[in-house]
């Protein structure tokens, strides 16, 4: 049985009309019409060849028919992998080589290997045993059964069966569907189109115009009073070729305790914010004067006097207070009375100045004042020890001086001689 393809049929053509035409050349076992093409099955191959020769381009109902042998690949075909093929080999030469063992349904060459589809399994096994490891155009061929799956992506043979959309007539790289199954966009489509980084041409509404001369995120967001004064996320920001200069930034939102007028005022924005009019960034909004940290305070020449900074001072004074304070006039020399010294400011007292202690007051307690130890008393005229190291000198040898006749406070004496 031979299958004949009949194409380019008129919509008014019926299966009976096709059957009557082909029955003139032989017996017809089956005749079917699908849309604008059909298939005719004839028993004899010679009769089929005669019908094809006479009915090809035959005018039927005002349209010329295309009559040819059906090229549909049988489902029982066997796929062979042919390796180590010469670069000068063509599909016709390879097909002719395998047709010596049986009918070949399809033959495709990919680089230095090829796939050959044979109609019967017996013919495929015979071709493997006869052609494997044999010389063909100067190279030893490797012929074996193919272990690869069915073709899932086009690239070999004819343009049939796009694996993305399932339609025929194009390859996957030409398919209008992208990898995610959505249609690709044209020059005027919406979404992430090719107009994202340019200006001119048809523009979409999505996140286009980012680096062009138009608003940054395009006014696709509705106008709001939340963060900007313009249309949502998008007043001219990153655009106009000016970077941050013409941005209008984050406006003060309404509802934060200020009136509606202030809610629309640009705080970090306007053209003065980032220096379009020659103003610096601090001029964008009024602010408190910047106070430098204490450790950065320096003299006009940028040098810090570490001696003055870290020298010892009385309690309550600081280096920075002394620097800022006006130097007072030199005070007169202080008296020895404690009352006057207490009235002097603490920052005028030299911590390293030593003054004699005031004379102790008269004892008011009834405690017994003990005699001063003779060991601790020494004559003024003596340059060394006036007593021996082994024993104490008699008391009568050391004369008493008038300085020790003054009554002493036992508590003051204890604190003075305590070690």
UniProtKB/Swiss-Prot annotation:
PROSITE patterns (alphabetical): RRM (PS50102), ZF_CCHC (PS50158)
RRM domain sequence ranges: 2-72, 78-148
GO cellular component, one term: nuclear speck
Keywords tagged on the record: Metal-binding, Nucleus, Phosphoprotein, Repeat, RNA-binding, Zinc, Zinc-finger
Localization: Nucleus
Pfam families in alphabetical order: RRM_1, zf-CCHC
ZnF region ranges: CCHC-type: 160-177
InterPro entries, per the entry: Euk_RNA-bind_prot (IPR050502), Nucleotide-bd_a/b_plait_sf (IPR012677), RBD_domain_sf (IPR035979), RBM4_RRM1 (IPR034897), RBM4_RRM2 (IPR034898), RRM_dom (IPR000504), Znf_CCHC (IPR001878)
UniProt KW Repeat keyword: yes
Signal peptide bounds: none
Domain of life: Eukaryota
PANTHER family: OS02G0815200 PROTEIN (PTHR48025), RRM DOMAIN-CONTAINING PROTEIN (PTHR48025:SF1)
Protein name per UniProt: RNA-binding protein 4.1
Organism expressing this protein natively: Danio rerio
Gene coding for it: rbm4.1
């Amino acid at each position: 049985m031979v299958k004949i393809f009949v194409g380019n049929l008129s919509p008014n053509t019926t299966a009976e009309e096709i059957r009557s035409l082909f029955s003139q050349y032989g017996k017809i076992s089956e005749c079917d019409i699908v849309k604008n093409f059909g298939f005719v099955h004839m028993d004899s191959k010679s009769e089929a060849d005669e019908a094809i020769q006479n009915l090809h381009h035959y005018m039927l109902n005002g349209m010329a028919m295309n009559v040819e042998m059906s090229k549909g690949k049988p489902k029982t075909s066997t796929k062979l992998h042919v390796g180590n093929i010469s670069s000068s080999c063509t599909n016709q030469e390879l097909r002719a080589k395998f047709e010596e063992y049986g009918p070949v349904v399809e033959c495709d060459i990919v680089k230095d290997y090829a796939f050959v589809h044979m109609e019967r399994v017996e013919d495929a096994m015979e071709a493997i045993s006869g052609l494997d490891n044999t010389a063909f155009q100067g190279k030893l061929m490797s012929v074996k059964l193919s272990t690869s799956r069915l073709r899932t992506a086009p690239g070999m043979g004819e343009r049939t069966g796009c694996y993305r959309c399932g339609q025929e007539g194009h390859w996957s790289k030409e398919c209008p569907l992208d990898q995610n199954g959505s249609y690709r966009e044209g020059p005027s489509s919406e979404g992430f189109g090719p107009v994202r980084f340019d200006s001119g041409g048809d523009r979409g509404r999505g996140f286009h115009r980012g680096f062009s001369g138009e608003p940054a995120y395009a006014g696709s967001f509705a106008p709001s009073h939340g963060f900007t004064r313009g249309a949502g996320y998008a007043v001219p920001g990153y655009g106009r070729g000016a970077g941050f200069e013409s941005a209008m930034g984050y406006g003060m939102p309404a509802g934060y305790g200020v009136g509606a007028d202030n809610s629309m005022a640009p705080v970090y924005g306007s053209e003065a914010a980032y220096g379009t009019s020659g103003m610096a960034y601090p001029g964008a909004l009024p602010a408190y004067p910047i106070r430098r940290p204490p450790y950065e305070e320096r003299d006009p020449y940028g040098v810090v006097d570490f001696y003055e900074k870290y020298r010892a001072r009385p309690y309550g004074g600081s280096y920075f207070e002394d620097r800022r304070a006006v130097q007072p006039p030199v005070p007169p020399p202080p008296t020895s009375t404690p009352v006057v010294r207490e009235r002097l400011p603490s920052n005028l007292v030299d911590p390293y100045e030593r003054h004699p202690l005031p004379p102790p007051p008269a004892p008011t307690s009834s405690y017994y004042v003990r005699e001063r130890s003779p060991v601790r008393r020494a004559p003024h005229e003596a340059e060394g020890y006036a007593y021996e190291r082994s024993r104490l000198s008699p008391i009568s040898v050391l004369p008493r001086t008038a300085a020790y006749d003054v009554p002493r406070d036992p508590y003051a004496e204890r604190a003075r001689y305590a070690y």
